[in-house]
Amino acid sequence: MTVKSQQQIIDSFKQANQDQLFQYYDSLTIDQQQEFIDQLSTIEEPAKLISTVEQAIQFSQTNSTSRNFTQLPNEQTASTLDLSKDILQNWTELGLKAIGNGEVAVLLMAGGQGTRLGSSAPKGCFNIELPSQKSLFQIQAEKILKIEQLAQQYLKSTKKPIINWYIMTSGPTRNATESFFIENNYFGLNSHQVIFFNQGTLPCFNLQGNKILLESKNSICQSPDGNGGLYKALKDNGILDDLNSKGIKHIHMYCVDNCLVKVADPIFIGFAIAKKFDLATKVVRKRDANESVGLIVLDQDNQKPCVIEYSEISQELANKKDPQDSSKLFLRAANIVNHYYSVEFLNKMIPKWISSQKYLPFHIAKKKIPSLNLENGEFYKPTEPNGIKLEQFIFDVFPSVELNKFGCLEVDRLDEFSPLKNADGAKNDTPTTCRNHYLERSSKWVIQNGGVIDNQGLVEVDSKTSYGGEGLEFVNGKHFKNGDII
């Protein structure tokens, strides 16, 4: 970088009224100055960013409860809870065929740390104390190994297919995640099929959204750009190019904290292939009217799919029963951030999505942000919110999908969704609830196959033994005790 381009970067920030960033610039060493300029150079148009943030603050103060929401049309939805075995078999075979032909990749969101779990380690390293003591990463890696094997058997192929696993980390989790995989020999996967990349960051601002905060005299405060930053990260890190060069057509994306996730689920992939969807999402049935979850719905005003937050629907609509079945809520499709994308669709849409706030607006979160006090030059940790962090939401692009190209598959929560979010002691989503749900699912599979578990105990079906309850005929008539691993 030349001195001239350094000056251009400084000027671009000063023109955006960010003079405060350079308050200590002249006192820095040449190396520190260079480091600072390198960091600032990642922000392409400071003036545009500031104006966008100010707009986002105004937008966050408007209310969306006036919009009209309803269920998605039947043609766009299905439920594994009441589908015929023939349809499930057909979708499974379509999915296995795509996997067997090397057309499926998996995209994992693994940027989070286990802060609420009392750990600074990446969440995927967490051990929920199963009898096998396996981490979330290991369980998921072994699901990939198992589904590769099942696809090979289905196609009667001599060669095992490869599912590429793209893992999005964040600055704080990248090194620890890679080290964990190396230490564990990639859990039996080939190191070449595991590709790590980082999500982006965005600057942190004061509460008015017009000044970027300094973390030190030569660095600004930054935070991860939210799960909606995935799309830009796919482009910026060459992942989209890699998918295309490998002939990958279908992507299954999920979050690391779901201990029951069916990684590269052939039913879900087959559902999307059969119906020619560009984008599809898995949902579980909302527990009750007051469960604080986002919902997949149809915006009646523009006839587009979208996600609405719990706070965006009226109490009356939240409690409304389905006219077709009064035992169910009318709006019940709880978002679990588990999506299918066609690569062709991503190629077409990612450049649009990442170039406009129309598709991926900034959402504002007021936070306590440790930063530099410009009055005395000292670093401080505030006790009250002193600034805002920006994030983008992955589902904000849903309305850009043609309704007939958007799918929504309801699955059984007990089989497919148990997230790890809180430390033990909380009501839900703890290591204990995750462990219990995992073992209850395993035990159900064993009993369905004629196995006997003594004294109502719970057993663990190893993730390499069975992907989704198949292949367990050998347990018929056998007795197992609490804590056994099968």
Curated annotation (Swiss-Prot):
Residues annotated for substrate binding in this entry: 227, 421
Pathway: Nucleotide-sugar biosynthesis; UDP-N-acetyl-alpha-D-glucosamine biosynthesis; UDP-N-acetyl-alpha-D-glucosamine from N-acetyl-alpha-D-glucosamine 1-phosphate: step 1/1
Gene3D superfamilies, per the entry: Spore Coat Polysaccharide Biosynthesis Protein SpsA, Chain A
Cell compartment(s), UniProt: Cytoplasm
Catalytic EC class: transferase
EC number: 2.7.7.23
GO biological process: UDP-N-acetylglucosamine biosynthetic process
Reaction(s) catalysed by this chain's protein: N-acetyl-alpha-D-glucosamine 1-phosphate + UTP + H(+) = UDP-N-acetyl-alpha-D-glucosamine + diphosphate
Designated name of the protein: UDP-N-acetylglucosamine pyrophosphorylase
Organism: Candida albicans (Yeast)
